[in-house]
Amino acid sequence: MEQTPLTYLKQQDEELFSAMRKELKRQRDNIELIASENFVSQAVMEAQGSVLTNKYAEGYPGRRYYGGCEFVDLAENLARDRAKAIFGAEHVNVQPHSGAQANMAVYFTILNQGDTVLGMNLSHGGHLTHGSPVNFSGVQYNFVEYGVDPETEMIDYDVVAKLAEEHKPKLIVAGASAYPRVIDFKRFREIADSVGAYLMVDMAHIAGLVAAGLHPNPVEHAHFVTTTTHKTLRGPRGGMILCKEEHAKAIDKSIFPGIQGGPLMHVIAAKAVAFAEALAPEFKDYIEQVVANAKVLGEELTARGLRIVSGGTDNHLLLVDLQPLGITGKLAEHALDEAGITVNKNTIPFDPASPFVTSGIRIGTAAMTSRGFKEAEMKQIAELIELVLKNPEDQETLTSAHKQVLALTGRFPLYPERG
């Protein structure tokens, strides 16, 4: 019998096979604009679906608690060495299962319960693990929030400095999940030093931009840098910590045995593949196109009367304020999904709506750039978004937009070799 992707799954589990085929069709047919998503290479997927998933490897290369780890040691060392080369880090831990666990490990390394931490407000662009009261970070530690200026909708570093001086945090967290502007890590380090605080940068969203040299590198300034390995870095879903050699043992101990047991060696291998891709010259070309696409998309949406938070973007994402249109993020997400355009509802700075409803949507260009979309396609996307957002409950409009989406995505095949 001819072997094709998912041959054995189809034979053994038709229900799951059907769900996965439907998901592949959704990814192929839709315009994927969720800023935290991307399309990995076939090589990354092959590594993640490899025999390495069978191997338990508690510990670190050369210091495992199980035998037979000599070859998974090679995979982990490749991932670590490549990450060091990309970001110029002295030490890298590639074992975190997620960005949240990477953040947790840093907190556990340097903080005690109740310590004061300065982090970005979630509705202003921060992340759950930056002190949200519903997250372990907000429960275990005393987080003080900074946000953006109400006029510029950008970080006001003077305000951050005043908060740091007032509250004397043990740690300052920089980085965001929905902030479209360049972050001044040098200034953050100066603020941290002025009050004797550690600086941790969560670069999950912009790691690919940092790798390509299109955003300042936080490794030069922060005591600790955490990131996911997907998003703009275009690897498997997972996490990573970068730090100075002086913190290496403490960080490694916080990951294992601190908060994790056996690492996911198949995922670490996939990280190694993605890091090799990020070291290639083509990756910089890709990221340059991601940023160019985001700028054009923002300009086109603005020209069509939509309000972009902070007036534009310096990276891969945009925040659209829907209040002038009189619709919610929840409605916009649903309407766009009906038209085959995938986004997520998102709070905007000073949002009067709840996080379950929101007054905005977040848009990213990393995934569709991976499919080959360029400036011309961004203009078409802007036209479709305008059409849907100005007629979110008109079924005829949504159907018409969906047909145009299918025509557009059909020109840029996704994983054609998967049948």
Swiss-Prot record:
Belongs to the SHMT family. It comes from Exiguobacterium sibiricum (strain DSM 17290 / CCUG 55495 / CIP 109462 / JCM 13490 / 255-15). The keyword Cytoplasm applies. The record marks 230 as: Plays an important role in substrate specificity. The lineage of its organism: Bacteria, Bacillati, Bacillota, Bacilli, Bacillales. PROSITE patterns: SHMT (PS00096). Its main location: cytoplasm. The modification N6-(pyridoxal phosphate)lysine is found at residue 231. One of its GO terms (biological process) is tetrahydrofolate interconversion. (6S)-5,6,7,8-tetrahydrofolate binds at residues 122, 126-128, 354-356. This is Serine hydroxymethyltransferase.
